[in-house]
Amino acid sequence: MRPPHRTLNSHQVHRSATRYLQEHLPLRDYKRSVTIRTLWAVLLVTAAEVGSLHATCQWLDGLPAEETVRQAVYACLPDYAELQRRLNRARAGRLPKALRRRRQRLAIDLTLIPYHGEHFRDPTEVYRSKAKDGTSHFHAYATAYVVHRGERYTVALLPVRRGAALADVVRALLRQSRSVGVKPALVLLDRGFYAVDVIRYGVSQSSEQERTLRLNSLSD
């Protein structure tokens, strides 16, 4: 018997996401001008729109000055490595148990977000690739995900820096997937991962009993 489904409206999704993320990434009020509620509204809209803090501050009404919001975000967030760990724990906490019961078809994707600005602290933050939308500079991240009963579940997430060896990215995503209990029966790779080091890694893994790694294009 299929479990019952119910449709959530945008307000319910927003409240649920805020409550759950606050448990794993506790933010705090910044002075008197930026409350926890405001911070999460800004961060969730920015993430949902795959946009910038600047664009969100221009779009939402009733916010403090953009620079004040920016300072509040920087004051509340932990360092980059700790932020990744907390968000990965949050993501893993809501994976269906069924994903851990048997090996899954795991798809690995490389996402490039065009970026026209400068790096924040380290030049390797900005990835270089074939020009798109008028730039060859991107913020890049890689994901490993499973499609289960028509829903996509991201089981591993990793930022990709300029100069990163793609085979190391694949290896790290598979390691993350195993750490949350999801083991691949088959790995499908986006064509962005078609590189000599990745192919060599795939060949080296094909004889292992622990998993099977096959190269397949996720896009034309």
Q: Where are the regions a protein language model picked out?
A:
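Active-site-proximal, Lys/Arg-enriched surface segment
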Residues: E66, Q71-H148
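Short, conserved catalytic/metal-binding motifs centered on acidic residues
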Residues: A41-V42, T56-C57, R102-H116, A144, ...
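N-terminal-biased segments
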Residues: P4-T7, A156-V160
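Short secondary-structure transition/capping motifs
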Residues: V45-E49, Q58, G62, C76, ...
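An internal, acidic/charged active-site-proximal segment
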Residues: L157-D220
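Generic structural signal for well-ordered alpha-helical scaffold segments
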Residues: L43, A92-L95, R171-R178
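Gly-rich Lys/Arg/Thr-decorated short loops/hinges at beta-loop-alpha junctions or inter-strand turns
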Residues: G150-A156
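Gly/serine-rich nucleotide phosphate-binding loop at the start of the catalytic core
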Residues: M1-Y74
